[in-house]
Amino acid sequence: MKLFRKIQKWFENQENLYYLFLIILIVPNIVLCFTEPMPLVAKVCNVLLPFSIYHMIMSWSGNCGKTFWILFPFLFFGAFQIVLLYLFGQSVIAVDMFLNLVTTNPGEALELLDNLIPAIIIVVLLYIPALVLAAVAVSKKRRLSETFVRRERKRARITVIAGILSLVAAYLFDARYELKSDLYPANVCYNIALAFQRTAQTQHYAETSKDFTFQAKTTRPEKNREVYVMVIGETSRAANWSIYGYNRNTNPELTKIKGLTAFSHVLTESNTTHKSVPMLMSSVTAHDFNSIYRQKGIITAFKEAGYRTAFFSNQRYNHSFIDFFGKEADICDFIKEDTGDGSYNPSDDELLKLVAAELAENASKQFIVLHTYGSHFNYRERYPADNAFFLPDFPVDAELKYKDNLINAYDNSIRYTDNFLARLIRMLQEQDIDAAMLYTSDHGEDIFDDDRHLFLHASPVPSYYQIHVPFLVWMSDNYRKNYPDFLKNAEINRQKNISSSASFFQTMLELGGIDTPSRNDSLSVINASYTEKNRVYLNDHNEARSLDDIGMREEDFTMLQTKGIVYR
């Protein structure tokens, strides 16, 4: 009882709470010093300047509980930041993280939530008791002494001056230092503003893009029946495809298919679905991503050229460009939305049924876009249980101790994709027409691959495993006969350095014989004039940055070199 009274007395002391609240406010900044690859001067600034501002604000009122509650938005940011650091290991809350709150469907969020329980427990223990203590201080009108408040205000002024000097030093000694990117929580506030701006631009997309036209036309004879299928995979990384040298047989069917070219050195320019897929479906790249608000997608190009178009997706609406571009098609079906059941989780097989029905229409010119669910976590749900080849594939909780199970389940999902694509190719081949298929994945995935123990994707700083993706071109017998140079050029280019984000759209236009001012054959992997470009990545602020300027670690560059991928 004596100890309890001492503890109670300590927490009732408002001066103790004042310092406790200050420490809690600055915890995320201290943690970021250990996770972010910043020079020492930047780390000092990242703690000293925010601490001085918190100190100044806390000294405004004699009731520290009231001030602590006024700072609640920053406590929320801190909690969010700690959870993200637990999940990704580094970086501040990105613009994409805020946008994901809108674009990620509840099913995906629930799949992940169970695996964040340790981080959530940490956040609850750190913030909830402090907020309760602050609420008690407010309700009981407990106040700091005037002497204490005056003293702390003087100290706060001194720390603010020191903080400003540390900011000046950061700019002087670190050429890459940016307040909007490197100073927490200023960077988070900037990112929130950007998220609101992008949300507003997205909401006005119909108006800003209404006059856009590709001025597209076909260069192919009208009498020839043609079918082109563009397949956008999900979370499939090239490192686990045996067609690229993986030591497990994850591609037993594709390796036997005639007319298939697999491109080895392909990187995506984004590790997020809501950015990567729109780049695959349009002419925008990391260099001009913000022009997307004024453009339309590849489906419109094929429609303008006289094609019957279809878009079939095994994902839910994301209320953004994937939806906009998909709905350009004559036939559009997001199959997860068909039942009204939020738990409906069909396999990608359902997409093949829709393809079969579309082919049965026997239109002269057909263009079909498929957006699969591929290898998205939870991996074990991406393939039928009786198709499990690598075992055990359960349990697959997001914990390091289950790494082998996770890899087994993930590899099973790759084998399922292999079977899916092989069946699609056979369907097209059986049509005995000019047909071609183009496949890539939006991004890859981390599965506790190295000492960093990273998991999933969409981290503000990507890893090698998140950006190296498969890229396939298949051409039917008839197509290869009529356009032999395309296969020859594909074989010549298959070991070259390629950006899926820049080349997918352009390659599809050339495969389909679509002529438009938006076409750039130097980016088409089936063109003799294909030209390798410097690698770039679309950062959180929609800027094209080189891979050595986005925070990637030595482990990532080592893997890129091991795979023979030029990253500059």
Predicted regions located by residue number:
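Transmembrane and membrane-interface helices of multi-pass
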Residues: 1-186
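Membrane-interface soluble catalytic domains
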Residues: 10-20, 59-67, 300, 317, ...
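A long, amphipathic alpha-helix that forms part
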Residues: 54-56, 353-356, 394-437, 473
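Active-site-proximal alpha/beta segments of enzymes that process anionic O-linked groups
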Residues: 161-230, 235-397, 500-501, 506-531
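Histidine-centered active-site microenvironments of extracellular/periplasmic hydrolases
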Residues: 248-249, 433-434, 440-485, 521
